[in-house]
């Protein structure tokens, strides 16, 4: 089937994508890249989805196989201490603690000054990615971009 789009964004979880992707092939839709959110970043996507998700690209909040040195250092240290692969929660907690410790080491000794110091952070290279804080106090993080190679999720950035 000839379609007039190059990509299809499906904002759902991996469990739904492995049901949707084969339908594209069944209806002879080809040449369409599947785009997804962090809910796709699960080993079952490639195990169950197989060839139907081979061109998929998704955003992820954390990827333990990232090529960024600051992520690899965290993953190695976590593995040494806990004999496990960290998840997004471990990476986020590590980053939160480090952001506070950096402020304390810089001499910020009150709640307000620590908060002000964190608000000024730009481009912090953390385990959960590069983080900057906006004027309104919200964090802006660059997501990890993942693709599918064989039966593995691989870093695209």
How would you describe each model-predicted region?
Residues 1-157:
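Extracytosolic ligand-binding ectodomains
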């Amino acid at each position: 089937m000839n379609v007039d789009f190059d990509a299809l964004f499906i904002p759902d979880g991996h469990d739904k994508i492995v049901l949707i992707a084969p339908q594209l092939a069944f209806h002879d839709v080809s040449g369409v890249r599947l785009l997804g959110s962090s809910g796709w970043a699960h080993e079952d996507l490639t195990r169950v989805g197989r060839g139907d998700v081979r061109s998929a690209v998704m955003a992820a909040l954390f990827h333990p196989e990232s090529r960024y040195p600051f992520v690899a250092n965290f993953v190695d240290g976590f593995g040494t201490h806990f004999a496990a692969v960290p998840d997004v929660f471990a990476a986020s907690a590590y980053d939160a603690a480090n952001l506070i410790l950096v402020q304390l080491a810089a001499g910020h000794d009150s709640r307000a000054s620590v908060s002000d110091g964190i608000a000024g952070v730009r481009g912090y290279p953390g385990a959960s990615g590069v983080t900057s804080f906006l004027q309104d106090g919200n964090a802006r993080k660059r997501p990890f971009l993942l693709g599918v190679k064989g039966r593995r999720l691989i870093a695209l950035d």
